[in-house]
Amino acid sequence: MAMLTLEEIESILTAHKKELRERFGVREIGVFGSYVRGEAKEDSDVDILVDFEEIPSLLKFIELEEYLEALLGLRVDLVMKSSLKSGIAKTVLREVVYV
């Protein structure tokens, strides 16, 4: 899989925001982790934080993760904003780049 820049990931997600909202009920989506910190390597996955209009079924959540992987051509670690534990939440919310 080819590595993308943060800007390319943002651009792809932005271009598909309407579909993400309509098909998956995504209210807010952003990138955090190694891509935001400029530490991503060839084998890095992309960490994506998502907030839904209503909590999806597990099947729908997995479907979204697979959709994003196909869209970006990268492995995706999808994290629900509502499931962040307080210890890590501060770090994630400080570095997340929303699109």
Swiss-Prot record:
A motif (GSX(10)DXD motif) lies at residues 33-47. GO terms for molecular function: ATP binding; metal ion binding; nucleotidyltransferase activity. Mg(2+) 2 binds at D45, D47. Its EC number is 2.7.7.108. Binds 2 Mg(2+) ions. Its cofactor is Mg(2+). It catalyses: L-tyrosyl-[protein] + ATP = O-(5'-adenylyl)-L-tyrosyl-[protein] + diphosphate; O-(5'-adenylyl)-L-tyrosyl-[protein] + ATP = O-[5'-(adenylyl-(5'->3')-adenylyl)]-L-tyrosyl-[protein] + diphosphate. Keywords: ATP-binding, Magnesium, Metal-binding, Nucleotide-binding, Nucleotidyltransferase, Toxin-antitoxin system, Transferase. It is an enzyme of class 2 (transferase). Mg(2+) 1 binds at D45, D47, D77. The active site is at D45, D47. It holds the Pfam family NTP_transf_2. InterPro entries: NT_sf, Polymerase_NTP_transf_dom, Type-VII_TA_antitoxin. Gene3D superfamilies: Beta Polymerase, domain 2 (3.30.460.10). PANTHER family: PROTEIN ADENYLYLTRANSFERASE MJ0128-RELATED, SSL8005 PROTEIN. Belongs to the MntA antitoxin family. Antitoxin component of a type VII toxin-antitoxin (TA) system. Overexpression in E.coli neutralizes the toxic effect of cognate toxin HepT. Neutralization is mostly due to AMPylation of the toxin by this enzyme. This is Protein adenylyltransferase MntA. The lineage of its organism: Archaea, Methanobacteriati, Methanobacteriota, Thermococci, Thermococcales.
